[in-house]
Amino acid sequence: SLTAKIDNAWSSLRNDWKLFAERNMLRDPYGTKSVRRLMERFFSSQDYQLDYQPTQIEANERKFDIPYICPELGQLPVIIVGDKTGDVELDMMDKCTLDQRVKGEHRQKSPHATMLDYLNSTEHIYGIVTNGQVLRLIRNTGQLVKLTYIEFDLRRMVEEDHYAEFCLLFRLMHTSRFSHSSDDACIMEQWFNRSIESGNRIRAGLSDAVQKAMEILGRAVVCGKGDGNEAFRQAIMNGEANSQTLNKELIHFIY
């Protein structure tokens, strides 16, 4: 059952995390080897089949440092990096290595920026980056103004025993969410499109509601019998106020 699979994956991650937390950093200064061991088992528990890429991936006459792909998921790209930067000061500040360019690497950008660049340069829509501590699902930004990604704090999830959050992670990140036929978008993309449609409907409904509220309040201000109403009507007659003034004040009041 699904519950049993989630429980097994959770138990496996917690056991692996104990070994990960007790690792010896002397032989792995950037944490790359230990993070890869941890996350390869993590992805396996969610039915990913990671195919390691010994050389950079070429796309559109460019090379990208994408160490893993998932062939069964349309070559879904995955970046796994160490959780240490090699810079003591940065590590002490707890800077996320997904947003930092690690010393000594040939990657010219941070892992997050590398993945985003790859997605925007190819037809791939989604990619995953992780340093063992944090996991991000990134979407290309071809049609978006803001960066779009979902982040899970794996360290806090395990160390603070947030099983409910792990259930959410499993249900969201399982391979079934990214598999698709040639005609249909994957479930993740279907969810994304529905969220945009839902947001548009909400904004349209909100716009109608705001307009109706402004009409009702506007009539009350102009036609009301109070001293303030009379003063406003007089201001309009004197040219001290106009419809734009009323509109601005109504918007300020509503929001």
List where the protein language model places each region.
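Short, basic/polar, glycine-containing "phosphate-handling" surface segments that engage DNA
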Residues: 1-26, 75-255
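Active-site metal-binding core of divalent-cation-utilizing nuclease and nuclease-like domains
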Residues: 46-75
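Acidic-basic catalytic patches of nuclease active cores, encompassing PD-(D/E)XK
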Residues: 21-55
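Surface-exposed charge patches
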Residues: 37, 41, 68, 117
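Generic structural signal for well-ordered secondary structure
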Residues: 31-32, 36, 61, 111, ...
